[in-house]
Design a protein with these regions (language model features):
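Interfacial segments of alpha-helical transmembrane regions
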Residues: 115-124, 198-219
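Membrane-interfacial loop-to-transmembrane-helix junctions in polytopic alpha-helical membrane proteins
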Residues: 78-89, 111-117, 202-209
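First transmembrane helix
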Residues: 86-108
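Membrane-helix exit/interface motif
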Residues: 104-107, 162-169, 187-201
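Hydrophobic alpha-helical membrane-embedded segments
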Residues: 115-144, 219-228
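Cytosolic/stromal cytosol-facing helical appendages immediately following the last transmembrane segment
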Residues: 1-85, 146-147, 163-174, 201-203, ...
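Membrane-helix interface/capping segments
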Residues: 133-167
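Core segments of transmembrane alpha-helices
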Residues: 94-101, 174-195
């Protein structure tokens, strides 16, 4: 089980403020008297306005009402009736393909190849975790919400998420997962086609690869749902809490590290397995330095500018 680096010598922030990563406190099992989940998580990030790392992001409190107003007026929900229909169709198709592929895999699995299959499945999960981190890092770090199409529809939700982290918990299953489910459909459909059309020998030749793709697709599809669970502090099913505590999926306490301003670490949000090793390798900071040196673009240069405009 991978645990947050609250005592790591190279993470002075979490070491100096261990109380921010505690799940128990004098005010109750979560240590809070917050009236909403949004207050709860924002207070975790901004308990000490004088903290040097949080001072530059202190306006997150001031802009909390703005985000709530946007949510109440539907601004945060960029979708339309057509978008909702597309999401429903994609979720239905994806789940059907997953079930069909699962039964094909069970039917064709061979015990003598089980170890190879398990390794392939594990690699699929790790790939999904890295992919979630790469997308999350890119959206948090680069670009402006003013960009045509991309800014409004892709970057802005990531920036708003840092101001109102629990807004994701107010989305239903379809809205949360529709886009990710859509991404996996071509790959799952190709798997079904292979199982239906290839001979048994050819199926076995591609079986390890298909197991890798299946677990990759499954965890990519569920990334937003897992992320949503990591921000849900009340009413989670027991089996979800168990998966979080065993770090099979992203734990709440682990993901909280990312939500400490300036949101520059722990980007992987599927399982979170890669967050600690990538941080030890300084992967993201080195990548940012290379990009800045090459292009002259500064990471997170656009951060919070959009919110200050009050639009």
């Amino acid at each position: 089980m991978v645990t947050p680096r609250t005592n790591s010598p190279d993470n002075s922030y979490t070491r100096e403020h261990p109380e921010r990563f505690s799940t128990a406190g004098p005010a109750g099992p979560l240590g809070y008297a917050a009236d909403t989940q949004a207050d709860l998580l924002l207070d975790l990030d901004l308990q000490d306005p004088s903290d040097a790392r949080n001072a530059s992001r202190g306006s997150e409190r001031a802009h909390r009402p703005l985000v709530r107003e946007r949510a109440s007026t539907g601004v945060l929900r960029q979708g339309s009736g057509g978008k909702r229909t597309q999401e429903c169709i994609c979720v239905g198709i994806c789940m059907t393909l997953m079930v069909v592929n699962f039964f094909f895999i069970i039917f064709h699995v061979r015990i003598d190849n089980l170890s190879t299959i398990l390794v392939a499945a594990f690699c699929g999960i790790v790939t999904a975790d890295f992919g979630s981190g790469l997308v999350h890092w890119a959206a948090d770090t680069w670009g402006s919400v003013e960009l045509p199409i991309l800014g409004k529809n892709f970057l802005r939700p990531f920036r708003e998420h840092h101001i109102d982290p629990t807004s994701i918990t107010r989305h239903d299953f379809i809205e949360t997962n529709g886009d990710n489910f859509m991404v996996t459909i071509p790959f799952l459909a190709r798997m079904v086609w292979d199982f239906l059309t290839l001979s048994e020998d050819d199926v076995q030749k591609k079986f390890t690869w298909n197991c890798y793709v299946f677990l990759l697709a499954l965890f990519v599809a569920m990334t937003n749902q897992i992320h949503k669970w990591s921000h849900t502090y009340f009413g989670l099913p027991g089996w979800v809490v168990w998966l979080q505590e065993c770090h099979v999926i992203l734990p709440r306490r682990h993901h909280r590290i990312h939500h400490v301003a300036p949101h520059e670490t722990y980007f992987c949000i599927t399982t979170g397995w890669l967050n600690w090793p990538l941080e030890k390798l300084r992967f993201w900071s080195i990548l940012e330095a290379v990009i800045e040196q090459t292009t002259g673009c500064k990471p997170r240069a656009d951060d919070m500018k959009w919110a200050q405009k009050g639009t």
